[in-house]
Each structure stands twice: as structure tokens, then as C-alpha cells.
Amino acid sequence: MSGYTGNNYSRYSSTPPRQRGGYHHARRSRGGAGGSYYRGGNASYGARYNSDYEQPPQEGDLRQTGAYYRNGYTDTRPYYSANSRHYQAQPSPRYNNGTNSYHLPQRGNSQDTNGRTTSASQEDNDEKRVKSRYRNMQADHPRQQPMSVGSTSSRNGSSGNSSTSSTSNGLPPPPSVSSITNNRSYHSSAYPYSSSHTYNNYHHRETPPPPPSNGYYAKGYPVHVPENRSNSDGSSSSVVKKKRILDMKDSPFIYLTDFDKNVKKTNNTESECEKAREVFKESDSIDSALEELNLKINSNELELRLLNNQCDKHALNIQLTQEKLDSLLLMQ
């Protein structure tokens, strides 16, 4: 970060350290020794950085933390692990010497950070330079709102000259779509989100697959029984009932054995069916007689068990009386 605004917060956060989970910096320097922990004093900051803590944000200078933190960018913190160190926002000469600075694309001649004049022919060279870390701020944070107009102020360089911005609110034009998609952001591997990350995919649900067809289920009956329909003649529209050869009062064995279907349709069909009826009637009578005999056998078996139990009871009574007699004989 090039500007030291005095908030003494971490590099990417606008929230004070005491409000971020109770985290405290190891050594927080105040007053004229601002930045002495990491750099070693106020002397190396240059003419622009003095002990004034409330410097106004420089016009068009996106490297200043105050320009973002004082205008609505309240959640620019990337993901930090639990034990990672939060370094203070310290200015460094590699962000001040102009090699890594963000130059405003202007039509006419203007002065950059160090007072050098740049013309319109140098715009291509400016694009080829190393992009600042906040060049793709909108790509890293697509939900953030643009900065307000109130952040514009006069910019005093080291030579005392002032430069005016090409836009009304003192900000450069937003990066193009090609620069967002083609250029890799500064947080290439450390930042958890990609440059084209959107935040509505949390509740994203894929469409369920279509239900399987009826032929998918090999076992079981289909839901709709297929009907064979032929539109060749009009008589097929009416349901044709198949007339059974045998009546329902006949023996069920006829239908279980499909005897009525196996009978050949000849002139003596009725005689064959009559013979089959007589045979099945005889078999039914025989089955009923067998059932009666089976019932008699079961009843006789129960009677035998009862008699056996009675015999056991009588045997116990005889043994008891014999013991009583023996006891009486011993007493005499």
C-alpha cells in the first residue's frame, strides 16, 4: 500500500483489529514512529508521507487504503487462516517509484505520481506495466459498489504540481471485461475465490434426472397395460367378450388345468366336456369322502390320546394306593 492513513489496520481489512475476533497486533506503533516496526522510521517515506495521520485520499490513486475504506468498501478481507499474521499497512518504495503504479489513461499531457509528464502515446506502455493489486478489485469483489463522488480531492505530488482526473468522480474507468477474464488477479493462489466468482451458487441445485420409463422396471407390472387396437374396422371398437365353454358352476379344476382351452373345437365338443364334468364330479366326491375319513382319523387319534392320559392317571392312582398300603403294613 502506498499511503499511510493512520488507521493502523491490516492490509485488506477496514475493521479494527479489536473487532475482528479479538485479534491484537504484536507491536502497534503510533505517533511519529508510524511504520517503524516494519520499515524503521518516518524518514524513508519521502516528502509525501509525514506524521499527519489524516491525509486526504489522493485523487485517482487507487493504491490508497483510505480511498477504499472511507467510501463503502467495508468487506474487502480475503480469507486468512487461524494462525496467519496480519501485517500492518506499511508504505513501501516499490509501490511509490512509479513502476508498479496505476496511471490514469488521459488524452493530453499529465503528471504522474513522481511529477513526470506522460502523453497519450504512453498509454500502451502503461497497460504493459505490472498491474496494481487493486486493478481487479471489481473482479475480486463483484458485489462491491463503486466509490462515491466524495472521495475526490486535490492531489499534490512531490514536485508541487497537481493533476486532474479524466472522470467526474476522480476515478479511472473500470477495467474492461477482457482484462477481468484474461488477466489473473493478484491473489492468484492465496485468494480463495476466482476472478469470475459469483455468490449465488451456494443454493444452486441441478435439475433432477427425468423419471425412468415403464420399460425400466424389469420386475412388476407396468402402470398402464398396453392395449392392442386396430382401426381397420369399426367392429373392433366394441369389447368382444369370449364365451366360455364351461359354466362357472363346474369344478374349479377345469379352469385350473385349462381343460376348456385344450379341448379341440370339433362337433363332439359338448360330449367331451360332459365326460370331463362326470370325471371331475367323481373326483370331487372321492375327495370329499377322503376328507371325511381324514376327519374321523383325527378324531380317533384325539380319543386315543385322551385314553392314554386316563391310563397314566389310573396308573399313578394305583401306585399311590400301593404306597399307602405299604406304609400301613410298616406301622403295624
From Swiss-Prot:
Bias (Low complexity) ranges: 39-49, 148-170, 185-199
Residues with the Omega-N-methylarginine modification: 30, 39
GO cellular component: nucleus
InterPro entries assigned: Tscrpt_reg_Lge1
Coiled coil: 284-328
Keyword annotations from UniProtKB, A to Z: Activator, Chromatin regulator, Coiled coil, Methylation, Nucleus, Transcription, Transcription regulation
Annotated Polar residues bias: 1-17, 81-122
Subcellular localization(s) per the UniProt record: Nucleus
A Pfam family that the UniProt record links to this protein: Lge1
Region (Disordered): 1-240
Sequence intervals crossing the membrane: none
GO terms assigned for molecular function: molecular condensate scaffold activity
Keyword tRNA-binding: no
Gene Ontology biological process terms in this record: chromatin organization; premeiotic DNA replication; regulation of cell size
Main localisation: nucleus
CDD domains, per the entry: Lge1
Sequence ranges of Basic residues compositional bias: 21-30
Additional remarks: Present with 2060 molecules/cell in log phase SD medium.
Function text: Required to activate transcription of PDR3, a gene involved in retrograde regulation of multidrug resistance, a phenomenon that takes place in cells that have lost their mitochondrial genome. Also required for ubiquitination of histone H2B to form H2BK123ub1. H2BK123ub1 gives a specific tag for epigenetic transcriptional activation, telomeric silencing, and is also a prerequisite for H3K4me and H3K79me formation. Its precise role in H2BK123ub1 formation however is unclear and is independent of retrograde regulation of multidrug resistance function.
Subunit record text: Probably interacts with BRE1.
Name this protein carries in UniProt: Transcriptional regulatory protein LGE1
Originating species: Saccharomyces cerevisiae (strain ATCC 204508 / S288c)
Gene name, Swiss-Prot/TrEMBL: LGE1
